[in-house]
Amino acid sequence: MNERRLHPFTVLRFLRKTLVVYLLPLVQVLFERNWTALHTALRQDALLFLLLCTVSWGILRVSSWSLDDTGVFHLHWRLGIRLDRALRGEMLAALTIDRPLLYRMAGASRLTLYPVGAAQKHTLSVCLPKADAEAVADQLMPLVKPALHRPAGGERAALGFLGANGLSTLALFVLAVRQTRDVPDWNPAVFAQIQVSFLARFAARWLPAGAAWLLAAAGFLLGASLMRSFAQTVHYTVWHTADQIGSRGGWLGHFECRVRTSEISFADVRISPAARLMKRWPVFVTAGGCSPELPLFVYRSGEEALFRELLPEFRMPPDLLARTEQRSLIFFAPAGIPFALCLLLTLVSATVLPQLTVTLLIPTFFFGALLAGAAAGYRREGLWLREGRMTLRRQQGLYLHCICVFHPDVCLTAAQSPWAASVGRTNLTLTFPGWVKLKVRSVPLRDVENFFSFMETN
């Protein structure tokens, strides 16, 4: 059993966390424009950086990994005391190999191992050379005669989202430019006519443009996130074997996920207004503490055969409306309160600060859409038993989650307030291996009792 060194990128997380330690004093000196102190700060930062590099070199020297003849992965740490962690392939619920662009340029891969039943914080993440990461993955979770599929729905869905975001961000940018041009020149005599405090005069001058630029920045960041998602869906491939299901893809960065089918906690089909429009449905799979941010695959309407081949045990919740009699109105609180506040501010700004009205309409419409989603959840969220499977539907923002439970080891927790007990309703929380929780709100108590009876008999 030969011990090997980790990739030097292992210390990137340590260096990133300590970056503020030696940059904060430098920024303070630059703002003060004290050039004498700047040279002193640069020398101090250089010494501190050398010290951190020495610590990083020590971390790399005392840490190593190995793979023995029986296929057990060992991670070693020797600094005063010896710590070893060992994982067999049978102990894993899933593994992921992530290679962002910077990692690809350095020939590195981030290998994350998800033990069965372990929470997200107890996963094992190591940075290895590309060939070593692939060898460890093939040893722990080998692919035996995989059946490959290349669904094209994910790329088009991501491209559709990206195009819509680009148009909306462009509109926000144009609005921000117009608001900036409309900012009046700073004339104390003019602003003195406004019989309010200095803070109110400052808000009257800068708030419309500042709010518009803030919305434009939020749209740009969302676009960057969608661009990253689109880049990861290029050349996307899904496979399944007798005991695994997984996917890989990416353009600038590569991502690979392998999931043991016997350890899948639940599968989630997320329905959004955009998904309904394009008729492409993303499917997410959770196994243990592994909940990838990317869908396992995206299928189009008419390609249900591929869905059934990849996840033959999945059962979609029935297309029924939930019982809404005596249901709690708490569904509307998270979106209704900010919607009412934004609507009130919009009405007030129409008379007090008209330049801000158009900008305030954007968050008002946004929270209005969330309120419409809450209304859909009020009518659709519920629990059903279907063909020997527990299925549920829950609303989160604009997404309607259609979930089928796979894993038998699930904890059901029913919580009732006095008001809910009086009307025969309760909140049900499902806790899966890895401490992943799903909550269904204000469901009839008899439906929850059916779930409990099903768990006792199965």
Where are these regions (language model features)?
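N-terminal basic, Ser/Thr-rich segments that initiate or prime the first beta/alpha elements at protein or domain
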Residues: 1-458
